[in-house]
Amino acid sequence: MILALRDVRPFDAPEQWRHPLSLVVEENSFLVVRTVPVLGSRLFRLILGAERPASGSVSVLDKAPGDLPRQEVRALRSRIGSVLIPDGLVGNMTVWRNLALPLIFASGMDEDEVERRIERVVEAFGLDDIRTRRPANLPADARQIVALARAVVGSPSLLLLDDPLASVGTVETGRLIALCRHFAGTVIATTHRRNTVLYENADDVALWDESGYRDAGHAAGQVAS
């Protein structure tokens, strides 16, 4: 399995996190979780090792991120792509340079391989016309697409998406989901509103609120609006 949480609660848990969270995500699956922003962001912080759980256990790619030394946390994060809130793009760098950053920080990758990977996502995500522009000057939908491309440029084993498609149209959402699944092994996406396209493309859909975490199955209609 890629991810396993067992009876997890964070320190200073938000009001909505009333019950311990248990969750298992298998390899090459796509999970969508309908939740509120604070729960999604805290969950991803636990997965990325940015905070330790107050109780329970977190296993990510066979590692306990909250217990790892800093260098090993960085190594684990190099295998995880993410689009969080805010998106973390560097506004005064070009799109091309933003795409290069996660590869530059990855050890052992030569310049030719960096360029090959960047060109691959530039072509797939349709970014050629904006590669020299800066994210600070892009509309919201284009910026979200750049953030997705940057998250998958390293072909991560796990991709974390925190409500990443809020500014993107329905047709484009379906295309971007397919690209994320192509470049990343396993995807976990949160959404803060009803998103039928996400639900329809997911292997599993869940609802998580103050009542707890519960599976909603595969049918988009089972998730309340």
Predicted regions span which residues?
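Conserved ABC ATPase signature
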Residues: R134-A142
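Q-loop/switch helix immediately C-terminal to the Walker
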Residues: P86, M93-F105
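ABC ATPase NBD coupling module
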Residues: P65-G81
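ABC ATPase C-loop
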Residues: A151-V152
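Conserved ABC ATPase "signature" region
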Residues: E113-I130
